[in-house]
Design a protein with these regions (language model features):
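Extracytoplasmic metal-acquisition and chelation regions
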Residues: 20-315
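Bacterial N-terminal signal peptides
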Residues: 7-19
Length: 315
């Protein structure tokens, strides 16, 4: 009797053990991708799909030139398979220190897991020489290239190439998703260019606060005639402001465009004195909760600019 009970107990134990055995999961763990900006993160998600888990260090409402380096950033970088930066010196004040502190050789410059998203972009405004008198000028050219939506394609290709380097087994997927993104982006760019003409933006003159909008202006046939900042990062003097107001009163300026992370008080005064509409524009994905994709960013830009142009035409 005791022998029977022992056998029964063993059978129950073995059965319970076997019932918990499951086949090994075949789904790969998503690659950890860390980007410096939300725009790069959005495009990385387009290319990587569910094979990536993407984190941006800079929030969409922050100035990407100046980001407080948090210890948590180093933890994220320590575990990253891929690091993607805007490059062209945009993050020079904060990203190199984080990369070195993270102690992850896989994502250092020159390693397979490092991506300079500008590597396939035709960069503009590269200075022939650099001096302190020029302010915070970027010696490697204007880094705000993502604000020409056509540049989303070379950005995506640079990210695709980086993903393939660190995960060659997913090359076919990354290639397909990149091609799909480029196709959809091409259709959207055509739509936005037509929209720029329809709302009367193309061919107009504008003043901007910072040199963030050079690529956007080139993409949509705008002429930037002056800046609130006389030089990048240098606050305007009273004389510069007065000269700017005089220039803007000539009546041929369509808009005063300003990035959403600068103090709006001076641009508001200039707009009041000149009658030129001030538009405060997002420069990045996730500038607010409704701008979730790269496509959303440009849809928002045109949705903000269109009524400002109408108000300017009435005044």
């Amino acid at each position: 009797m005791n022998r029977s009970l022992i056998c029964l107990a063993l059978a129950i134990t073995v059965g319970a053990t076997l019932s918990h055995i499951r086949p090994a999961h075949t789904e790969p763990k998503p690659l950890s991708v860390v980007t410096t900006t939300e725009d790069l993160a959005a495009i990385a998600r387009e290319v990587g799909g569910d094979r990536v888990r993407v984190t941006s260090l800079c929030r969409g409402y922050q100035d990407p030139h100046f980001v407080d380096a948090k210890p948590s950033f180093m933890v994220q970088l320590k575990n990253a398979a891929l690091f993607v930066e805007v490059g062209r010196g945009l993050e020079v004040g904060w990203a190199p220190g984080l990369l070195n502190g993270a102690r992850n050789p896989r994502i250092l410059p020159g390693a397979p897991g490092f991506v300079d998203a500008s590597s396939q972009v035709q960069v503009i405004e590269v200075p022939s020489s650099v001096s302190r008198a020029q302010g915070d000028v970027h010696p490697f050219g204007n880094p705000h290239y993502w604000l020409d939506p056509a540049n989303g394609a070379p950005i995506a290709r640079a990210i695709r190439d980086g993903l393939i380097r660190v995960s060659p087994g997913n090359a076919a997927l990354f290639n397909q998703r990149c091609a799909d993104f480029e196709q959809r982006l091409g259709v959207a760019v055509t739509r936005w260019k037509q929209q720029a003409k329809t709302i009367g933006l193309s061919g107009r003159k504008v003043v901007t606060y910072h040199r963030s909008w050079s690529y956007f202006a080139r993409a949509f046939d705008l002429t930037v005639v002056d800046y609130v900042e006389p030089r990048p990062g240098i606050p305007p003097s009273p004389n510069h402001v007065q000269d700017l107001v005089t220039r803007m009163k000539q009546g041929d300026i369509a808009l005063l465009a300003m990035e959403d992370f600068f103090d709006p008080r001076l641009p508001q005064k200039i707009a009041q004195q000149t009658g030129v509409p001030l538009v405060i524009l997002p420069t990045s994905v996730a500038a607010d909760e409704k701008i979730k994709t790269y496509f959303d960013l440009f849809d928002r830009l045109f949705a903000t600019i269109a009524p400002a142009l109408k108000s300017g035409a009435k005044s």
